[in-house]
Design a protein with these regions (language model features):
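N-terminal Rossmann-like FAD-binding beta1-loop-alpha1 element of flavoenzymes
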Residues: 2-28
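Conserved Rossmann-like nucleotide-cofactor binding loop
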Residues: 11, 34, 251
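Short, well-ordered alpha-helices that flank and scaffold nucleotide-derived cofactor binding pockets
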Residues: 17, 21, 202, 206, ...
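Glycine-rich FAD pyrophosphate-binding loop
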Residues: 21-41
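Dinucleotide-binding Rossmann-like beta1-alpha1 core, especially the glycine-rich loop
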Residues: 42-167
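Active-site substrate-recognition segment that forms the wall
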Residues: 43-46, 51, 55-93, 223-229, ...
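Short beta-strand to alpha-helix junction loop
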Residues: 102-115, 137-147, 187-206, 317-323
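Helical element adjacent to the flavin cofactor pocket in flavoenzyme catalytic cores
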Residues: 146-158, 180-235
């Protein structure tokens, strides 16, 4: 088959690899000048079932509302639109334990399959992308312990491998933790991973090129046309394919809406910063996450990446206070 893939991030690149490996003729389109230039560029890099827990859970609405009156909160509204409020209303309809458990179990199945595919791909292609093993979640007090329990309850049901640690045990796993930071407990996931998503995507791009994948960068897809031979409409031409796979992140909704497909998406943003490791003894061995503030620190080779501060809204201008 002749297949078009819209988006050259990690989702688009892994899709291109799988299809090209099965001898399909693959073309990848992206509006940027290279792969992994947007959502795959500098995310936390953490691969964890715990981090995949649905945000729609009991107390989420209050967390967002109360965050408007705090100097720092894990989640806040920022230049929102009415569309964002409609999304939050739908999300609030699932803020109960039954919906949370059902949705989380489905996400775990998907992430388990994804993790198995990643391990197989890494083994077959011998990819090195600054990966590390293990994920430590810090609980500052009993309130953090209580908020994490619904997630752990589902993880226990599906047989996920994790351990509840004391403060002393947590510091043995991550000796660089600040001794002045209070730790009530910690949750350790030995099978979780962290890695450089952009580096992984670029490595896979090289593999795809060897398999004959055609890349069209700086090519914005204006629209898609359905039919027996779907068309990808660019600014100056239209190209026909047997199938089209849309991996364009938030831009996917605008491309699919004219075709009658409405994706339940809204815009969430987060901040991240990367820094070189000057003294390995002062850096984490893998990834550490603060449960209360949802801020993570990941070890990526000779660098660390700090990420967090979720904001709902489409304001792409960085807030200076968030960078100070």
């Amino acid at each position: 088959m002749k297949v078009a893939i819209i988006g050259a991030g990690v989702a688009g690149m892994t899709t291109a690899y799988e299809l090209a490996s099965q001898n399909h003729e693959v073309s990848v389109f992206d509006r940027r000048g290279s792969s992994a230039e947007e959502g795959s560029f500098a995310n936390s890099g953490i691969l964890s079932h715990y981090e995949n827990a649905p945000w729609a859970r009991a107390g989420m609405g209050w967390d967002i509302f109360s965050g408007a009156f705090k100097s720092y909160t894990a989640t806040r509204l920022q230049k929102w639109r009415w569309h964002d409020l409609r999304w939050l209303r739908k999300c609030a309809a699932n803020n109960n334990s039954d919906s949370f458990g059902e949705h989380f179990r489905q996400l775990i199945k998907l992430s388990q399959y994804s993790q198995a595919c990643l391990q197989q791909l890494r083994q077959n292609l011998h990819l090195e992308y600054d990966q590390s093993n293990g994920h430590l979640v810090l609980l500052r007090d009993e309130e953090d312990e209580f908020s994490s329990e619904p997630v752990l309850e589902v993880l226990r049901e599906v047989g996920s491998n994790f351990k509840i640690l004391s403060e002393q045990e947590a510091r043995l796993i991550e000796p660089a933790l600040n001794p002045e930071t209070p730790i009530h407990q910690a949750i350790y996931f030995p099978e979780d991973e962290a890695g450089n998503c952009r580096q992984f995507t670029l490595l896979l791009k090289g593999v795809c090129e060897g398999l004959g994948v055609n890349f069209h960068f700086n090519s914005t897809v204006q629209a898609l046309q359905a039919g027996k031979k779907p068309q990808v409409i660019l600014r100056d031409q239209s190209l026909s394919f047997d199938a089209v796979v849309v991996c364009a992140g938030l831009s996917s909704a605008a491309l699919l809406k004219p075709l009658g497909i409405k994706l339940p998406q809204t815009t969430w943003q987060a901040y991240s910063i990367s820094a070189s490791v000057r003294e390995p003894m002062d850096a984490p061995k893998s990834s550490v996450m603060d449960e209360r503030y949802k801020v993570s620190i990941s070890r990526l080779g000779q660098r660390v990446r700090i990420s967090g501060a979720r904001e709902i809204g489409d304001n792409t201008k960085h807030q200076e206070v968030s960078l100070s």
